[in-house]
Regions:
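Active-site groove signature of glycoside hydrolases
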Residues: 113-133
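Structural motif corresponding to the C-terminal cap of alpha-helices
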Residues: 13-15, 114-117, 156-163
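Bacterial N-terminal signal peptides
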Residues: 7-17
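Structural recognition of the beta-strand scaffold that forms the well-ordered cores
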Residues: 27-31, 58-63, 122-126, 169-173, ...
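Short beta-alpha junction loops
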Residues: 34, 63-68, 129-130, 175-177, ...
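Terminal, contiguous helix-loop blocks that mediate binding/assembly
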Residues: 23, 133, 137-430
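N-terminal extension/subdomain marker
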Residues: 22-118
């Protein structure tokens, strides 16, 4: 009988974690580039330290990119690594200077944080200035070099190549203007959700005491709920600070992005066809009506809301636009913001308007994403070139311009464009 009871209790002990449910461990990886925002950066660290996080939640921090810090424990012109628990910076390491705007620095940080603090769930937050396609994390000690979209992608790609099972549950950008299609299209390979703002963010940024407090109170909350908490806590804190501010925060469901990307590639072919056939003035006038986020600061970002862009251009391929809209709605898990905007639907994309010459000059280094979305990338660059008075030869594959013939390959759903004698444009019967 003792042997039977002994075997029973041994089996119960082995099954107990599965039956009762083991706690979900979470590592929050904070990549914090201080620059001229270092005082706000330190305040956010103190917010994190105000939360009594449970043992299964780790906050791993890398702080750099600043000449000096308001906290005496941190060293300027160096990389500081540590974890944060209640009222404490733990295991502080001061490393030699590294450029926070370099992909290798980001990759090394992920390697350290995920290696030293393995978890069931990973949240990566990039903290600093943001500038849409120009990137994020501008290191003042490296001539304000930033992580471009390519470089964020390269860092995650390099780490994932060495650790194929690694995936982020959430990637967040506590920075201005980073809820972009361009970034989401790249991050879909590495994360489930992306949290970011279409608009500028005020200096106080995310409310870390709020959302980490929510996680500490319920470590089993889903990643989607954590992402929504980030957005809601941001809004609550910022509205309390300034009820009249322009605010936005989005949670993007990255699993739906690949379908959106494929459909936008097809839609971009229609837009390119329109450009080549006399519709440049029409598209330019439509662009002038679109609100550019960040325009009330020193310069325009030329980032426009995705639905603003789609509603303005749907005349060029109405059926394809309807499909694109339906997929886009699936991409936006949650979007919140103030009511100052005509369009605020959760994600922006870049369409040149105010900074055409700068964009053309920076295209190869900062924007060219032909390997990820070749048709849209070429449409944007071709449009900018024509807008600047230049000539551009589009090379993307387009359907034969016969009447009504069905095409194959990428554009198999596309009917070819018909033209009225005299040069008037008729939208294709898509």
């Amino acid at each position: 009988m003792k042997k039977i009871y002994g075997a029973f209790f041994l089996l119960l002990a082995l099954l107990a974690p599965a039956a009762l449910g083991q706690a979900t461990s979470t590592t929050i990886m904070m990549y914090m580039c201080g620059t001229d925002l270092q005082s706000a950066c330190v305040m956010d660290m103190y917010e994190m330290a105000s939360v009594d996080v449970p043992d299964d939640v780790t906050i791993a921090v890398q702080a750099g990119g600043a000449y000096q810090w308001d906290d005496s424990d941190l060293t300027g012109e160096a990389v500081n690594r540590f974890t944060i628990s209640y009222d404490t910076f733990n295991d502080l390491q001061t490393l030699a200077w590294q450029n926070m705007g370099d992909s290798q620095t980001l990759c090394d940080f992920i390697d350290w944080a995920a290696g030293a603090y393995p978890a069931d769930r990973y949240i990566l937050v990039l903290w600093d200035h943001g500038g849409g396609y120009n990137g994020v994390c501008y290191d003042e000690t490296a001539d304000y070099d930033s992580l471009t979209i390519h470089e964020v992608n390269d860092a995650l790609y390099a780490y994932q190549q060495r650790h194929p099972s690694f995936r982020l549950d959430i990637i967040g950008f506590d920075a201005c203007l980073m809820a972009t299609y361009e970034m989401a299209a790249h991050m879909a390979s590495y994360a489930d959700y992306m949290v970011a703002s279409e608009e500028l963010e005020p200096g106080i940024g995310w409310n870390y005491q709020g959302w980490i407090g929510d996680l500490a109170a319920n470590p089993e909350m889903s990643s989607a709920d954590i992402a929504v908490s980030i957005a809601d806590q941001f809004m609550a804190a910022c509205l309390s600070d300034n009820p009249n501010d322009y605010l936005s925060q989005s949670v993007i469901n990255l699993s739906a992005i690949p379908t959106l990307k494929a459909q936008l590639e097809t839609f971009s072919a229609y837009l390119t066809d329109a450009l080549e056939n006399g519709q440049m003035p029409t598209i330019s006038r439509l662009r002038q009506r679109m609100y550019s986020f960040g325009k009330f600061s020193d310069a325009s970002s030329d980032q426009v809301d995705f639905m603003s862009f789609l509603d303005a251009t749907r005349q060029f391929a109405p059926n394809m636009a309807s499909q694109l809209e339906a997929t886009y709605r699936q991409c936006i898990l949650y979007s919140t913001g103030t009511d100052m905007f005509d369009y605020l639907t959760g994600m922006s994309l870049f369409l040149p308007g105010d900074n055409v010459s700068d964009f053309i000059q920076d295209f190869s280094a900062r924007y060219d994403c032909g390997e990820t979305y070749p048709n849209y990338s070429q449409f944007v660059y071709g449009y900018a070139t024509l807008l600047a008075g230049g000539n551009y030869h589009f090379t993307l594959q387009k359907p034969e311009q016969t009447t009504g013939a069905q095409t194959g390959g990428l554009f198999s759903s596309m009917l070819t464009t018909a033209y009225v004698p005299g040069g008037s444009y008729v939208a294709p019967d898509d």
